[in-house]
Amino acid sequence: MKKIGVLTSGGDAPGMNAAIRAVVRTGAYYGIKVMGIKQGYVGLMTDNMEEMTARSVSETLQRGGTILQTARCLEFKTPEGREIAYANARKEGLDGIIVIGGDGSFRGAMELCKAGFPTIAMPGTIDNDISCSDYTVGYDTCLNTVMEAVDKIRDTSTSHNRCSLIEVMGRRAGYIALEAGIACGAEVILVPEKEWSFDEDVLRPVLESKARGKKHSIIIVAEGIGGVMEMAKVIEEKTGIETRATILGHVQRGGSPSVRDRVIASEMGAKCVELLLEGKENRIVRMKDNKVCDIDIAEGLAMQKTLPESLVNLVPKLTV
């Protein structure tokens, strides 16, 4: 193993730079040349790569986003597109590739393995929705960003006796909504995984909150539920309580990564390099029971992940 490539793919997440840095510096430690592949699989398609050194990744640990940039590459999903990518990887002499991203990126990693390129994947996504891993890089920073935003919205909601709906990311998974909702003392948390009734699960808690003398109501809604603007209008019409909706959007993806994200990303990045050195391939580096370990990509993608029942059951106890 003399030369490897590293790419970030899909949505960006805080901590990706810490992972890239760990890959590059661990590679340098073992005498391996590391090529940074720009814009994810697009960089493989266009042969957009450059050598990275221990010095070139200095001052990146604290930066949000990804210094390699990222993109979604539909062409790589076609056999013809993949052949172009494989030819470029061969031309660069890559002995292995490390992919940082979500489940779609992992499927691309499996294709690379089939083509004869030893590939290791690691989870970098704010959604925390990788089935085989207890944690994904970027999640903690995202939660802190949401918490800070909701705390500020609460300040102005209290001043105006308002109900505030806040939409957070999570198209298919409600981890951000659930944990941020608990951390922010939300009266209502709506996630895609749980059935809900507008009258029982939204209107009733808002009215009960007002009856108890509270000066605000906070409703956290996962992106997969959506419709917060219309929901706000209906709440105001039916309760008479002034209601406003906020979509936090891409602010959740940015910002300097937290300590947790920097440390876990560094651990995972180093582990990726070491697995390649051990001759392993087609693996996902994951967090399981607070330990960094690995699992076969196909096996990992086939697993199911559910919201922690302990947290789901905690919500009604905290909203009395």
Located regions from the model:
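Short, ordered loop/turn segments at secondary-structure junctions
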Residues: S9-D12, I37-V42, R72-C73, G102-G104, ...
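Short Gly/Thr/Asp-enriched flexible loops that form oxyanion-binding sites at enzyme active sites
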Residues: A18-V23, G104-F117, A177
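Flexible, glycine/charged-enriched surface loops at secondary-structure junctions
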Residues: I32-K38, T156-C163, K215-I219, E242-L248, ...
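N-terminal phosphate-binding or glycine-rich loops at protein starts, especially the Walker A/P-loop
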Residues: M1-M45
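Short, acidic/small-residue loops that bind anionic groups at enzyme active sites
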Residues: C113-G138, T145, L190-K194, I247
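Glycine-rich oxoanion-binding loops at beta->alpha junctions
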Residues: L44-I97, G104-S105, V137-N144, E148, ...
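C-terminal non-catalytic interaction/assembly regions of soluble proteins
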Residues: G227-E230, I235-V320
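Accessory alpha-helical/coil subdomains and C-terminal extensions
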Residues: V99-G101, E111, Y139-E242
